Each structure stands twice: as structure tokens, then as C-alpha cells.
Amino acid sequence: MDQECIENYAKVNGIYIYYKLCKAPEEKAKLMTMHGGPGMSHDYLLSLRDMTKEGITVLFYDQFGCGRSEEPDQSKFTIDYGVEEAEALRSKLFGNEKVFLMGSSYGGALALAYAVKYQDHLKGLIVSGGLSSVPLTVKEMNRLIDELPAKYRDAIKKYGSSGSYENPEYQEAVNYFYHQHLLRSEDWPPEVLKSLEYAERRNVYRIMNGPNEFTITGTIKDWDITDKISAIKIPTLITVGEYDEVTPNVARVIHEKIAGSELHVFRDCSHLTMWEDREGYNKLLSDFILKHL
């Protein structure tokens, strides 16, 4: 699996950040990826390695305090810090070379924030199930909860309002929500499970996000850069699943703000479209990249 991938650590802003660089045999472009969470790991994005066959070298990394990377002081658990970390890593590995940037979920928020500041270092931007506003995303997730079968909706509201996140009925309802809106598959790939395990084990998810995907009580809860993203002028592709927990309405706001951006809704998919339609997803991304070399 990893014969064409190099794993290593880079010292970034005083801490060691893990990365995996999967090189294309005949490289045409470089793609830097940003995982979600905040607090997951790069593992669930590994399906994107398939794009090396199209001449696209893919960089994966575990953000600060995530996966295999070291944790900075918790005062640095911010999106701004994540932007500077990404820029330092890009510069360290690729120098002045422009790359494509893809962010998934929270990584899409991070990628938008990066592009607002550093789009001169990018050839193009891909936002996959990403967001420009946490409050809007939470509002949309609450709408999805309201549309759940009564048994699950009531359990989420009853136990969520009292913070009883460990209650078995609440956990069952969360699991149901995830299988509708996170990954619509009975058997979840080991790469996805590994990322979820890291989120559970490390501190970032709990501190920056909160107890679960739709209960965002952490430090990012008020984050919103919707009014800044119209400054992004590079080629931009926005993807979202039809049943995505970060809904098509959230994606449309980004699409409307970034002039000339493309929006693609994956039918019958939810949040982790890279697994639900692996072939179609990788083709869409590689076609976009190769079109904007």
C-alpha cells in the first residue's frame, strides 16, 4: 500500500507534525489535503491516493494535536494557528511551488481560511463537505435532527439538552444520524474508524468541536468567514453529498460567494463521499486539477 508513499515528521512551529507524501510516478500536479474534525487524522482521506495514477502527488498530514502529530499549548487550538501550520508545512516540503489544496469537512473550513490569506501559493482549491460558517452548519444539522424518526430526534433533544452524551439511547440516536449523514454504509472502512479513534483519544476534537458532530460547543462554535471568502479568486471546486451533515445549503453559500466556483452534489451520498463514491469522487477531483494545471 505504501511503496510510493514516504512517511516522516516535519518540525513546524516548534512541534513535530506527521505527514505522508504519496508521489505520482509521472507527476503533473501536487495536492495538499486537510482532514476534518477538528481532531480527526489523515487516515480517512487515504482513498485519495488513487489519484497518483493520474499524475497527482498527494500530501496527507495530521494537524496539530491530531493523529500522530504533537500537541502545542492548548491556547494555540485555533483555525488561525492551523492556517500558519499548513503554510509552514507547504513551504518546508514544496518551497515556492504552487499546489492544489483540498479540505474535507472542518478541513474545508481550514482550507477556505488558508486561501483567504495564501491563495497566491495555490493553483486551485477544493472544498469537500466544508463550511464557511459554524453557526449556519449547526442550524442545518439541527434541521436534519428535526427530520429524523421521532425516536432518535427525541433522544437527541432530551439527552443532548442535559449533556447526557453517554446515555445508550442518545448514543444509538447519534449512530443512526451518522449512518444517514456521515457515511451511508454498513461497513465503515478501517481508515475511517482509525480517524474516529484518534478523535476520541486526543484532545483537539473535544476542545475545538465538542462531544459529537452536531453538538459544537468548542472553541470554533462562533467561527464564520462567509464575508471574507469572496476574496478567493483561484479556481475552486465545492463538493457535497446529497445527505451530507454539512448540507448542500452550506455548500451553496460558499459557491455563491466565490465567483466562478464549481459546485457538485453527489447523489445518494452523505459526508464521506470519498468512500461512498470513491471512483466518481477521485475522477471529479483529478479532472478539476488536470484542467487547471
Curated annotation (Swiss-Prot):
One MF annotation (Gene Ontology) recorded for this entry: aminopeptidase activity
The organism's place on the tree of life at top rank: Archaea
EC number: 3.4.11.5
Gene Ontology CC, one term: membrane
Catalyzed reactions per annotation: Release of N-terminal proline from a peptide
Top EC class of this enzyme: hydrolase
Gene3D superfamilies noted in UniProt: alpha/beta hydrolase (3.40.50.1820)
Transit peptide is among the record's keywords: no
GO biological process: proteolysis
Active site: S105, D244, H271
UniProtKB keywords: Aminopeptidase, Hydrolase, Protease
Record family assignment: Belongs to the peptidase S33 family.
Assembly mode: Part of the tricorn proteolytic complex.
Function of the protein: Cleaves H-Pro-AMC as well as a wide spectrum of amino acid substrates and several peptide substrates without a proline at the N-terminus. Proteases F1, F2 and F3 degrade oligopeptides produced by Tricorn (themselves probably produced by the proteasome) yielding free amino acids.
Name under which the protein is recorded: Proline iminopeptidase
Natural source organism: Thermoplasma acidophilum (strain ATCC 25905 / DSM 1728 / JCM 9062 / NBRC 15155 / AMRC-C165)
Source taxonomy: Archaea, Methanobacteriati, Thermoplasmatota, Thermoplasmata, Thermoplasmatales
